[in-house]
Amino acid sequence: EPAWHAAKIVPLPSGGTGLPRGYLPALSCPSSGSCSAGGAYSDASGRTQGLLLTMVRGTWHPSTKLSPPANAGQDPGMTIGALSCGTAGNCSVVGGYQDATGNTQGFVAREVNTKWQGATEVVLPGGAAVKGQISSVHSAACASAGNCSSVGTYLDNASPISGVQGFTLDEVHGVWGSARQIAVPSDANANPFVAIGQVACPSAGNCSAVGSYIDTNNVTRGLLLSERGGSWQPGTTLALPGDANAFAGAALSEVSCVSPANCTALGTYTNYKGAVEGLTAVELHGVWTRGVAMKMPASAGANPHVFFYGFSGLSCPSVGNCSAGGQYLDSSDLYQGFFINEVDGTWQAASTLALPAGSRAAGRNGGVVAVSCRSAGNCSAGAAYLDGAGNYQALVVNEVVTVWRIGRRIALPNGATTVGVDGGVYGLVCTTRRSCTATGSYQSSSTNYQGFTVATN
């Protein structure tokens, strides 16, 4: 199994002081020794800038600032939402920023042969609000160099109140197009309040995305989206388990695809007892099956309040074989982390994240955040938990032949004693059996966070 080293601090661009709210969400490693990561940092003037990291041949290069779009405000508030690499050194990054008029806009930026280009504003669909816009690109997936798809949300110009709509946005042969409004299911509310979880693209122009919308009864429903041959299809509604509440509040947060039209999604819903449970859904040959309730650990409370962080907590190395992780509330009202495995097409009962000695709980800001599988039943994960003194710590956990081991605390840079409430492992990718990389953040002082990288080789 992989042996993890101590974490190393991420040196910030000149004048950088720290990471706002410890935000370093994005990591993509298309091959062993080649990774890109992204987040946000505060510059010397306290402005929020986009942060980019690139690993070449196993070595992290000095971090760089992502140049904001030309119409960005004085404080661009650059916030990277996701990053994906088609091949080593050829990636795309997406997110949101503040323009000079105070609107929040979406952006995209490309890395070409390890050189990051400046970010450009997303051209929103016709009918987007001109004033008071709040738009952002939430997720991106690149199937090959220069071929990516992304999903996000924006405000339309409906009166008297703008509606929250979703959009898709494709990069084809290195050129990003304009955003297109997602066609929501026919039972959607006039304001569908679209929320987007993730997109996954196993091949160029063939993607699946998940999220949620609100129907005419003000019930939140799971939203499923498919792109086939470069064309996005109208959204469909996830069918829920038989024990779902009439007001099930279903939402899908993560998706992973093994091949085009063969994907797995994770989410949550409320059952008829009022308990928030986890669910899995499978797309087979382009058809999404009814969601299936997760079986939580025996220690789960009557309402386990299942929660997924939505970064990279699901990994499917082959059809019918997945591993995932999240958080739940146990019968003692303590927040715990959990793992759940799909083996040869059958989801097993979830297991509790095993914590180091002296710890009782993962904590409200703890649990499993990132999962990456090299092969079926052989995975690694990043998590956070509360130590015996009540401080949050970062944890790496290895799964060997479908058995999750006890997690190992990450040794933080410069003698730091906690990752804080906003820190921990955000991204983790394993490219081979023994080669894994993780990124995250930790609390460096009472008011500041810094980034870290940690690896196995």
Which residue stretches match the model-derived regions?
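Residue-level hotspots at or immediately adjacent to binding/recognition sites across diverse folds
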Residues: E1-N457
